[in-house]
């Protein structure tokens, strides 16, 4: 873990769970595997607080545990999962994807499970149905069966998966009271055979509408009833979590489709979308290529609203194969031709375009021209860079040294003689894409950390004004629910003065820009992480 990743993990833990969980989490990140006693001693926190913090982290899949160095008889040791902590950056994106694919019901299902880490199916269905009913007009309610249907579709498409069961020693009677049973946590949920098997639940009815006076107590009652509800419905002990890997595959596919559509046209993007959809079940997460598909299969699987004749499809496939970006490759000639989507090559090209864009934005179009030239030609001397890029010697020298100082370009010395004399040495400039992508990834982590810190600072500085605004909004909602007159509502609204209202609008505008910036930088982070992981897997 780099310093920027540790800092970002700490900020995310603090924002979502508070200072105590952030203290425990960052201590585990810095010190690796620790026992409960060691963690409480080193953080100087009460043992009860450390236990609760670990429960929160385990509940959200950010901490794993298992037998320690002394074996099953020794104390349990805890290990933090930094990758899952960083996934919190993408929570808005996961929720938006669920909404775009499965509507408001899918959105609320994913939101509830992300908020609580893991939930039973019956508890999720009831909570989501209640929330949807609360937003419906009087006299309408959400049927549980509709929520169950949306939940089932999310499981069938692997966006939700069962939490792996705890593997513990069966017998409490065989061991002594002083020796607790060994408990281990499976690292891979998909190793469990029932990972995507839906339980049969006896659940019928409609969502209940909450009144404004009940809102404060609703969450407490829901937490107390969760176990009772799940045991009554028949899914006690079967908890579900969000499958981040499946969402990431969807994001990767969408990035590839978008790139093809921008480079060629919408029809080409739809053909690639069809190929990715057909092979998403048969292609592993780290595969460099999708499974080979024949032109006949692709033609039959195209959406009916795309009236593409077979000869036109063959022309599009030929165009995709011949394109320099190499998103699609040809793997054979049977069945009208066998085609694959080159996933690794697509991610490499997307990462390369990102690097070029960053260089252009920071250093200008001429520096970007030099950067692209080095990416294409591999190794060049300074004189060759000047000639190929058609840039004056002085400017080219300054730009190369600027890129070199930022570690975006590397300099390699190749001596002609053993004495390494400068006059008898070749100095070659080059761009190594993988280390450069790693460097940019660290810059992105730092940028997101800065954005979060700035947002927290803005919120803290205007805490009084935000609390006042929330109180007034609550009063207005209560008055509207009781059918108050317009004059009463106007009086309450005037409790916020014009300067305060202007300051509040400005604050919300800044917060929205910071949130938008976080999401945009996270898209770059995801692209670079996918490229780095794909490159490592292909070696």
Swiss-Prot record:
It is found in: Nucleus. Component of the RNA polymerase III (Pol III) complex consisting of 17 subunits. Belongs to the eukaryotic RPC3/POLR3C RNA polymerase subunit family. Keywords: DNA-directed RNA polymerase, Nucleus, Transcription. It holds the Pfam family HTH_9. One of its GO terms (biological process) is DNA-templated transcription. This is DNA-directed RNA polymerase III subunit RPC3. GO terms for molecular function: single-stranded DNA binding.
């Amino acid at each position: 873990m780099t310093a920027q990743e540790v800092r970002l993990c700490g900020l995310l833990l603090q924002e979502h769970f508070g200072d105590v969980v952030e203290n425990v989490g960052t201590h585990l990140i810095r010190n690796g595997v620790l026992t409960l006693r060691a963690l409480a001693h080193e953080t100087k926190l009460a043992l009860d607080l450390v236990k609760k913090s670990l429960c929160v982290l385990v509940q959200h899949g950010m901490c794993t545990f298992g037998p320690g160095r002394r074996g099953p008889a020794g104390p349990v040791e805890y290990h933090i999962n930094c990758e899952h902590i960083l996934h919190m950056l993408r929570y808005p994106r996961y929720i938006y994807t669920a909404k775009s694919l499965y509507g408001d019901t899918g959105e609320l299902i994913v939101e509830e499970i992300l908020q609580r880490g893991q939930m039973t199916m019956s508890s999720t269905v009831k909570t989501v149905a209640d929330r949807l009913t609360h937003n419906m007009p009087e006299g309408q309610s959400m049927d549980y069966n509709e929520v169950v249907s949306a939940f089932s579709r999310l499981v069938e498409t692997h966006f939700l998966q069962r939490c792996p069961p705890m593997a513990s020693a069966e017998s409490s009677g065989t061991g002594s009271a002083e020796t607790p049973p060994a408990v281990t946590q499976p690292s891979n949920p998909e190793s469990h055979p029932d990972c995507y098997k839906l339980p049969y639940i006896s659940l019928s009815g409609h969502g209940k509408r909450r009144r404004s006076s009940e809102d404060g107590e609703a969450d407490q009652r829901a937490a107390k009833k969760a176990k009772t509800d799940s045991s009554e419905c028949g899914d006690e002990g079967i908890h579900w979590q969000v499958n981040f890997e499946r969402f990431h595959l969807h994001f990767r596919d969408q990035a590839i489709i978008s790139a093809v559509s921008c480079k060629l046209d919408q029809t080409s993007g739809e053909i690639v979308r069809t190929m990715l959809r057909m092979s998403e079940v048969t292609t592993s997460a780290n595969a460099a290529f999708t499974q080979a598909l024949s032109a006949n299969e692709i033609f039959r699987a195209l959406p009916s609203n795309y009236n593409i004749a077979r000869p036109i499809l063959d022309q599009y496939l030929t165009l995709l194969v011949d394109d320099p970006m190499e998103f699609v490759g040809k793997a054979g000639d049977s069945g009208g031709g066998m085609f694959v989507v080159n996933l690794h090559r697509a991610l490499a090209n997307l990462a390369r375009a990102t690097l070029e864009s960053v260089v252009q934005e920071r250093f200008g179009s001429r520096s970007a021209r030099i950067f692209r030239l080095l990416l294409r030609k591999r190794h060049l001397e300074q004189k060759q860079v000047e000639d190929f890029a058609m840039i004056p010697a002085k400017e080219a020298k300054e730009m190369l040294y600027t890129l070199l100082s930022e570690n975006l370009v590397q300099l390699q010395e190749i001596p002609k003689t053993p004495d390494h004399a400068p006059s008898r040495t070749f100095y070659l400039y080059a761009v190594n894409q993988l280390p450069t992508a790693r460097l940019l990834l660290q810059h992105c982590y730092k940028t997101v950390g800065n954005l979060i810190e700035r947002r927290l600072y803005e919120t803290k500085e205007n805490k009084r004004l935000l609390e006042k605004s929330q109180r007034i909004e609550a009063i207005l909602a209560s008055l509207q629910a009781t059918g108050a007159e317009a004059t009463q509502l106007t009086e309450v609204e005037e409790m916020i003065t014009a300067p305060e209202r202007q300051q509040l609008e400005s604050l919300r505008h800044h917060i929205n820009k910071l949130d938008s910036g976080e999401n945009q930088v996270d898209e770059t982070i995801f692209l670079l992480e996918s490229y780095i992981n794909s490159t490592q897997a292909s070696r």
